[in-house]
Amino acid sequence: MDIQLKETSSYAREADIDLSWEEIAADFEQAIKQFSKRVKLPGFRPGKVPRKVLMKQFQPAIEADFVEKSVNTYYLKALQEKEIIPINMGSVSDVHFHHGEHFKFKVAFEIEPDVTIPKMKRKSLKVEKTNYITDDEDVDMAIDEMRHGHAEVQTVEDGAQLDDYVICDLQEIDTSGVPIIGKKLETRYIKLGQIPFDGDNQKKLEGIKPGEKTQVSVPVDEKGSTSTFELSVQNVERQILPEVDEDFIKMADPEAENVADYRGRIKDRLGKAYDQRSEKAFDEQLTDAMINHVNPEFPPSMAESYLGHMVEDVMKNNPAATDKEKIKEIYQPVAERYLKWYLIRNTIIKNEEYEITKEDVQADIDQRKEANPKEAKELEKYFKKPSNRSRLEDDLMEKKVLAYLKNFTKIKEVKMNTKDLRKQSEGNVQS
């Protein structure tokens, strides 16, 4: 077999495959026998038609059948011989074959490209790292969240107040007050004072009681268009929050000694959570900086395949997401970023000869168990599953690659108060 490879881009290849008649004669004879079993000729039993008769009457059909069934076989042999792993289905063209002659054809396919990493200097990459500074309001909010989780719910008969929950039906009505058929929302929970039941809607709902009705204006699309709904109250509920006393602290955090200690422990946990948030954002910016530095080419088929899987997952997990083309448009940049990083990462792993051993994985699991002794058994059980160990192995490799990139990164540390984050969040909600 003669194989001529042509490189048409960093990821595209074209193979010209040429097999002599001597190499394929035996396979062609086998094709004749298989064809004979399927053909029906008067005076002959299936499989017993003489070769000469078959070739005289059906040679073009036999040749076409042979080509169709053999191209893939010889293509795979050529790939094995050249030690090539394609990432897509090859596109076959220029097929030439007749009995007694060479069998020639061409296949265009894509491979995972080799990525060239430019020479890295000490400050090749520039990345910001945000260090968050928490405050007492963060602690208060965390405690309030815990209190809401253990609140006692009471039915209210004397009228709704701010922060009460109104259980109601919402019937959309037209400008004349007539209900619109098919536009009724039943048994909805709304919180008084929470968007969109603030402002004018809040004033209408304050003091409302079970059995009463009012009209509210509610946004119905992303553009902010509103419709009028008749709101019928089924019930009003109020959350009675527990006091932050010794009993509450024992229930919320048995290891806390008193209120001050409880608040301190919450502040520590919040600090660790914000540190993790900071590290995650930094890692994403670091990979983005490296992607921009290298900007590798990627095979279109690879991107299309990965994007297809992403779209399937989105539609599977979100039944309301039905516009496939819109989802593809949204997630295409995400898929392309992932593939660029995947190619860069693999190149670094190969160049630096990185590996993650079983001992590395077990050491990380042991470290997790030591840090969380109460969850040691659960962790052991979780990481017995091969897919979870494989995911951990991949995470450890990611950390190793990112640690390598930090050697070539100028890091600008910036401080951000969490109160500024809260202001940003409030601004986003209002806009």
Q: Residue spans of the language-model regions?
A:
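Phosphate-interacting basic helix/loop segments used at nucleotide- and nucleic-acid interfaces
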Residues: 86-94, 142-163, 211, 269-272, ...
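Residue-level "contact hotspot" at macromolecular interaction interfaces
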Residues: 43, 96, 159, 204-207
